[in-house]
Regions:
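N-terminal glycine-rich phosphate/pyrophosphate-binding loop and immediately adjacent elements
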Residues: 2-110
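Conserved redox-cofactor binding core of oxidoreductases
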Residues: 93-173
């Protein structure tokens, strides 16, 4: 929604009206990185959806937070910047969704970023979305990462390369 509206509004010939079901994103917890927890299942900013029951999960359904505020789900995602596994995108393409494979969408991810890691095969340094690393390293998290590595879980230095199985610090917007 917002991304498309922004792109369309760059052409002065276009007039764009963006309608969101929720209100302004002035709920304080939206703007605090750890505050995403307070947005989940809060009907003020979340649609409070649940998945269908799944036999492989003992017929449980799980919460599926979806933003009901200006900015949609991007406003309640904890400011995380994680693209997802490349094989998930490739599976979408294999199911007939041409244009949705990892190699198809990666250029758009790259184009959108202004990443403090700089420009490389997975990142850009001149896009509209500022992406940054966590500035503070917490001892507890470092110990968790090291313990995970001792158990054979790989350390991931960049969760946006398409192979994000492992443990590490993720980036923020």
């Amino acid at each position: 929604g917002c991304v498309l509206a922004n792109r369309l509004s760059k052409n002065q010939k276009n007039k764009v009206l963006l309608i969101e079901a929720g209100g302004k994103d002035n709920y304080p917890w939206i703007h605090i990185p750890v505050g995403y927890y307070k947005t989940m299942h809060n009907p003020k900013v979340d649609w409070c959806f649940h998945t269908e029951k799944d036999e492989s999960m003992n017929n449980r359904s799980i919460r599926y937070p979806r933003g009901k505020t200006l900015g949609g789900s991007s406003s309640i995602n904890g400011l995380l910047w994680i693209r997802g596994q490349s094989n998930d995108y490739d599976n979408w393409r294999q199911q007939g969704n041409n244009g949705w494979g990892w190699d198809d969408v990666l250029p758009y991810f790259i184009k959108s970023e202004n990443n403090e890691l700089g420009k490389n095969e997975f990142h850009n340094d001149s896009g509209p979305i500022m992406v940054a690393n966590k500035k503070i390293k917490l001892t507890t998290l470092e110990e968790f990462i090291n313990a995970s590595a001792e158990k054979g879980i790989p350390k991931v230095n960049d969760f946006n390369t398409g192979d994000n199985f492992g443990v590490g610090y993720y980036q923020f917007t």
